[in-house]
Amino acid sequence: SLGAEHLVATHGPPLSGATDIDERLRSYRDSIQFLWDQTVRWTNRGATSAELAHRVRLPECFGDDWLTQQHYGIAEHHARQIRTGLFGFFDGDPANILPLDTQDHAEHLIDAMGGQGAVRSRCEEALTTDVRWGLYLASQLAHHREASDEDRGLLATALRTAARRTPSANVRNWCITKALDVEGSIDMSRHRTHRLGRRQIAGWDLATSAGVLRVMIEPKKMKGADCHIAIEVEGERCGLHFRNHILCPTSGTDAPHTLSCTRATWDGLLTGSVTLSEALNTGAVTINGDTDAVISAFSALDHPAFTR
């Protein structure tokens, strides 16, 4: 609608020519509507998430332009994302209403198929004829309680096979990275823990930064806990109430305990560059109230700075 003669895209090549730009962007826009509308259509007809992945396919007319080819995401992922966003996690498949734990599922399935050896053989065969099935079987073997290095290697092979056959950079890069992960060739541990960076939290007020801690509670460590703590940092004040296996952000009013420190120290605690015990020992953190109760409350956090 702007009549632009040149378009620099966030994803994709630059375009020139007002008519060409208009036609190609219209096609791009229509491809998105197609995915949305057909996802809703098939969902209304009872399709599950897995079924949507195979029923909602972009027509051939969208396959001849870089803007609508599946170099980045893929249609089957978009369809499932649309469905989940509109209707929630349960897709109508009875198997998904009360699913087994991942490891339990793998062990039951492998046992039903004749054991790990039988499944390995089927997986190896499937990787030459049906990569999706092979990847699924390899994943189940790797989830098994008695998974071996051979099983993890088979999963890595399956992932690399899928990576070589997809046009999607997202899928390809994830599969290659996961293959390296399951082989132990790269350390992905930092992606499986809470991470807060100084630049990230520098612009947050105290209440926002303290409130983030609520999602780091380990419920098993909260049995019987009821500890309301005010946090005071350079003129700002908020509160954290450890109770009922949750951490409830408060204003700090009427809290019987107060933790005080500088903003630099507080940020250091959140980023893990200093621990609460170290800060208490150096005097960088002071506690007015029951010090042991405060330390015990904070130790319920799944965060290295507060773990006892």
Describe each PLM feature range.
Residues 1-51, 55-96, 154, 158-161:
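Divalent-metal (often Zn2+) His-rich catalytic cores of metallo-beta-lactamase-fold enzymes
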Residues 31-45, 119-122, 265, 269-272:
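Solvent-exposed, amphipathic alpha-helical segments
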Residues 70, 74, 114, 118, ...:
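Alpha-helix boundary/N-cap detector
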Residues 73-79, 87-119, 228-230:
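Helix-loop elements that line ligand-binding/catalytic pockets
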Residues 105-140:
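Alpha-helical segment of the N-proximal tetratricopeptide repeat
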Residues 125, 133-136, 143, 152-308:
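Feature captures hydrophobic
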Residues 146-147:
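Short coil turns that delineate tetratricopeptide repeat
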